[in-house]
Amino acid sequence: RKHQKTEDERFLYWCDVKGMLVWSEMAAAYCYTDYAVEEFTKEWMEIVRQNYNHPCIITWTPMNESWGVSQIETRKVEQHFTEAVYYLTKSLDTMRPVIVNDGWEHTVSDIITLHDYEEVGDTLYKRYTEYKDQILTTEVYHSGKSALANGYEYKGQPIIISEYGGIAFNNDDSGWGYGNKVNTKEDFIKRFDDITTAVKKIPYCCGFCY
């Protein structure tokens, strides 16, 4: 997953050659405006047309975590915008799945993706097993977010945890990551194993991306 950027075609060429699978993504607009809608749509259509013939691309992902559509949970015009992007993408490519807003507050989507940076494996596993029915609704599932925007229902799509982990090392103040920082590579491997094992045990989870 080349996160929130459009890759140089040389990168995609070598992914074709080496057999690496890629999610094709897009940089976010800063906020929702008429101008952002026009420019985003134009640029995204160019991206799809330009990269359509790269077999390495397995899904189109134009938006992430409601960036650029920050009120999508309840605001109809932002929901309609994501629907328009979904169907425009489908009009150019009927084969690949489209994940319009990766992570949460989905409207129309071929895959339901969730982001969760929980650092304790047992907590992560229990969240997605004990509260499955609540998660796949418009109820909040984690960090104040819901899997679906208001007015939308889960329709049996595959479910992927497309962001998790993000473990930071305690090496300096500029280290980036989530949760408590680890001090050694052994600590990193232990936590990575703990949360990854938990994700793999979730019975309805079809895939994951660290």
Question: Where are the model-predicted features located?
Answer:
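Substrate-binding/catalytic cleft of secreted carbohydrate-active enzymes
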Residues: R1-Y210
